[in-house]
Amino acid sequence: MTKFRPLSLACLAAVLALAACDRAAPPAATPAVSPPEMAMIGAHLLEGLGDHHFAITTTHPEVQRWFDQGLMLTYGFNHDAAERSFLKAAELDPQCAMCWWGASLVLGPHVNATMDPADNADAWQRLQRARSLAPNASEREQAFIEALSARYAEQPPEDRRALDEAYAAATRELARKRPDDLDAAVFLAEALMDLQPWDYYDAQLQPKGHTAEVVQTLESVMARHPDHAGALHLYVHAVEASADPQRGADAADRLRTLVPGSGHLVHMPAHIYARVGRWHDAVVANQRAIEADDAYLALCRGNVQGVYPLGYVPHNHHFLWFAASMEGNGALAKASAAATSERADLQELMRQPGFAGLQHYWLTGWFDRVRFGRWDEIVGVPNPAPDLPYVTAIWHYAQAMAAVRQDRLADADAHLAKLRPLAADPAMDQLLVWDRYPLAHAARIAERTVTAELAAARGQFDDAAAALGEGIAIEDAIPYDEPPGWHAPVRHTLGAVLLQAGRPAEAEAVYREELRRNPGNGWSLFGLARSLEAQGKPEAVQVQARFAEAWRNADIRPTASRI
């Protein structure tokens, strides 16, 4: 939510006020959290969070349940709700050391967010409460509290890299001393991932940094406890961008029904399913995740809590759109695109530094119209506000695509003339998708695509193929993201243009490469079947059957690999 780091919660954290969310106040100077504070927090005991248990020292029978819930919510990246659970446990038993440990833990960084400096004081104070109470806790609890002590400082440096490395070292020592403690191993894996979020493989898809240790650690946990939700979740993230995402399929299958009350954990299998060509499974995972999130938000009775509904909830709709698009389900894609756009429609925020990525997700409805050839709907979209150059660029792209398809080539030329300077403007490189990659990538792919479509419409196929080759180079350079940073594979267009040009052997090579990158997608299978037919190759029959299977949930009949 993300990263985006897939949806960067670090950026979204600043909009808590827009979400009508009451964050937990700093801990009181007294040992207990005051009842008024807890009323503001609005914690709920939730159903469907599994049966994971971490025994803690407490005198109150209900505290253990609140703590276990907080831990599972932490494993499911709903950190705000986890914080409320831990603080509720601390209210019920102010002498519970691990309750304060949890309330401190969740304020730290994770793979989808850096730490908010505004949380430093709370994290430190809660840690000190845990440390002061540790002598009354078990040896195991003391070990976890001691490891967390390396994560924070009373006066932290502006660059907290040294603290994050110290915490990773402390969790490694914790796991070394407690080799049978699976939670210790999971926290070690997460601490190592936090040192290189969403950057686990090099350009050759070889593991980099701590990735090999992360994978080995998580596989060791899963071998001993195949249903450890925290390990399964992190393992999906650890292998999804690898050269062999199939190795995460068993973890994905186990995770999809393991914690039905956690929308994010229900959604996570889609990250593997999309990488291995199980597109309908990705659709179903996101549909179920949306249902789980709807139930969770309904329980909150309108008190939309924290960054979870601003990051993770829209991510499920966006991913549903992506998966539905790849299996040709136009009606579902249209509905989920609209839901994504609606949730990203934060007009003031998307104009602020650091939040330009919202523009990209707000435009999902426009991308969907291009993807499925809803040209009349595109023509009716008014010119956007001029202070959003990326939005303006994509508007010209969509209008130009509609004009080409409606044989209004002069209009398409006019839109391309407006799109080109916007895409080339160096200022576009400063508009980032959640601090990971510039919106300029998408704008430049859009410009290359329109250039190619216009050339193809005029029979200039060499020029079209060259422009699309440049677009593919840009697309391939976008860092790994799910859904990808461009709405539809450029190779879908290149293959179609090559077939149109009577170059089926070249088209075949393009489609095979695209199927290597996005296995089992019907668009490429359709194009591959046509390219094989054009060459008289008998394999076309088998590929056509694969297309029919991939397209079993589709509601459109394609005539090419792009509309």
Predicted regions: what they are:
Residues P61-Q69, Q95-H110, N136-P156, D180-Y201, ...:
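Amphipathic alpha-helical repeat scaffolds of TPR domains
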